[in-house]
Amino acid sequence: MGPLKGVKVLDLTSMVSGPVGAMILADQGAEVIKVEPVSGELVRHMAATHNGVNPVFFSCNRGKKSIALDLKSQEGKEILFKLAEDADVFMQNFRPGAIDRMGFGEKVIREINKDIIYLSISGFGNEGPYANSRVYDPVIQALSGATDIQADRDTGRPKMFRIIIADKVTSLTAAQAVSSALYAREKQGISQHIELSMLDSMISFFWPEGMAGIVFAENEVDVRKLQGSQDLIYEAKDRFITAGAVSDSEWQGMCKALEREDLIDDERFATPAGRVSNAQERKEITGAEISKWESEKILARFKACLLYTSPSPRDAHESRMPSSA
């Protein structure tokens, strides 16, 4: 049982951006019915399977029921309309205009069920030069500024996250939006059409600090100079670790743990603002000091000083081993 018990969701989405959002609703107790083509959704066929199911498909669709329909056939259409009669949520992520051409647009579904929450996920929204373009995660990473945020600090070369991130951020946004729409229907008696783009979701996700440099018009700064403070991977004698200090007390604790109390009074690092603006210098100094210690010992010293810290799963020496490929 979960907070969405009794909520029925029709999930016509595919790939990752929609299915993960619907899966979150299922995790919270909703009855989610995944509507797939007769051949099965594409992700089913994109990796090796175990007992007939591949891990990516499973991890995007757990907790759902599934039905295969030929939505071009009259029978398939009638079944979908029947399912929509008592559904609470209808989710789709076809390219703009496609769902209307298929005959299942928001206006059509609302004629069947006036109280339904209708969610449309797209890459770029319904208007603009990219509106009808095909979209996958790397495209959104590039256009949203993610590749700039991830750029190599030395060369400036844009870099991507090594995971699908835009699809999953959109899914989280979609699940939250649907939950809010269900609450609004309960409290205000309104049923909404939620139009959500992957690009909007990503920009909103990155905005608080990733795009802080452009918040104030005519007072922009290059936020990339500040983001280096997040690259807190250090190499101890035997493995990689992460550790950091944000507050004054944490910085003082780090200096003591490293036996570098002289840095406490260093004007460059004496304030939070100073530690951010001089992040690269600070990282180089702390990195050089951490490299003198065995990881277990320095992590224990950091922990005793109440710093946030953790070992990295990958062994430092293992990571330098040549690839056998």
Q: Model-predicted segments: where are they?
A:
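N-terminal helix-loop segment corresponding to the beta1-alpha1 unit
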Residues: 1-187, 213, 217, 324
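Structural signal for conserved beta-strand scaffold positions within catalytic alpha/beta enzyme cores
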Residues: 11, 34, 68, 120, ...
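Glycine-rich beta-alpha junction loops
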Residues: 39, 124-125, 198-203, 238, ...
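Residue-level detector of beta-strand structural context in well-folded domains
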Residues: 56-58, 194, 232
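Active-site-adjacent beta-strand anchor residues
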Residues: 92, 196, 243-245
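Substrate-binding/catalytic subdomain of NAD(P)-dependent oxidoreductase enzymes
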Residues: 182-221
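Single conserved hydrophobic/aromatic residue that forms the stacking wall/gate
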Residues: 308-325
